[in-house]
Amino acid sequence: MSQAYAIPETADYPVFIGNNQIEFKQRKVPEPGPGQLLIQCKANALCASDLPDLANGADISIGHENAGIVVKGGEGTTTEIGTKGVVFLMGYCGDCRSCNLGLTNQCVDKRADYGFTHDGGYAPYSVINENVFFPVDDDVDLAEATMLLDIMGTGHHSIKRANQFHPDPQSLLVMGAGPIGLGIAAMAKLTYGKDFPVYIADMIDYRLKLAEKLGAVSIQLNDHSLKEFFAQHNVDGVDIVIDSTGKTVARQSSFQCLNQRGVFVCVGHGEQITLDVSADLVANERAVIGSEYFQYNEMAENYEIFRKNRDYLKQVITHRYPISEIKEAFAKFNGRDTGKVIIEQ
């Protein structure tokens, strides 16, 4: 596999200058230091968390759902040149209490958040610490490999978090049918089986139809409330709610659909939820928990799931654009009639 790559001294980097504008600027291609890899970025998935940088500007080339090829290794690295793979967002230290427990998403001494603090997947090249690189097989399409990150990783981790509190659920509701919500729905189906009831609520028809293709039962909130929908379909409630919206109205309304012993999982950052501790939590033994990204050690399991269910999972990807059309890609994504949108280069 090992081979030599011609690495230019400079390359065109997309720069988010604010006001929804992106310009390309020549920058020097960085050198990897000890323990670091230089990645030639080949695919990056758009995410709603990119939008603040699109609006306000960023000092780096962002993109945290990055898949690419190792083209150079720094001193002490062992990854072969030419290896394809994906980049785990969090530059975990590997030495703190959390990391020693395998809880790399809870590292207390992170060295980077790739795509937020350091150049990410929209850049032509990015430098990462070797420990955040996860290799994939040569036959894997790198655009599809990005699903190992926010789609599969975040989705599956949230389900595992729920199972820690409710190991025998009979139903699940996802709030929000954006890419993260679609990922949660897909991973729920793969975790619990095709006959397990997975409901998903949103107001955008395009995304709800996509969720139906994944096997979820869609709830169009423009037509009825959650309570009305469940009453019409003789559903008393659900055992798990996973909120990907971060919106108070979504959290409040969906929490009221939880059964006894139900688990409410907050995946989306954002707004608040107000609860009556006695009535909402204690009496019914419900739990409200958070779920942050996922752990690096979950990648191997998710990769096996990906290999076995590739055709099913890649339905989440609905649009692909070359890096030269990154502005058009964000315009399409902002319109919300998409699933996962991928930039390729």
Identify the role of each PLM range.
Residues G82, V140-H224, F229:
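Mid-domain Rossmann-like dinucleotide-binding core that forms the NAD(H)/NADP(H) cofactor-binding site
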Residues Y13, E65-I69, T83-K84, S98, ...:
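Residue-level marker of beta-strand positions
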Residues C93-M175:
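NAD(P)H dinucleotide-binding glycine-rich loop of Rossmann-like/cofactor-binding domains
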Residues K28-N44, L54-R97, V132, D137-V140:
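Glycine-rich beta-strand-centered segment in the early N-terminal region that forms part
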Residues M1-E9, D205, Q252-S253, Y296-Q345:
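C-terminal hydrophobic helical "lid"/dimerization subdomain
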Residues V86, D239-I242, V265:
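N-terminal Rossmann-like NAD(P) cofactor-binding module of classical short-chain dehydrogenase/reductase
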Residues T248-K308, Q345:
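Glycine-rich phosphate-binding loop and adjacent beta-alpha segment
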Residues F230-V241:
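A short acidic, Gly/Pro-enriched loop at the edge of an enzyme's catalytic core
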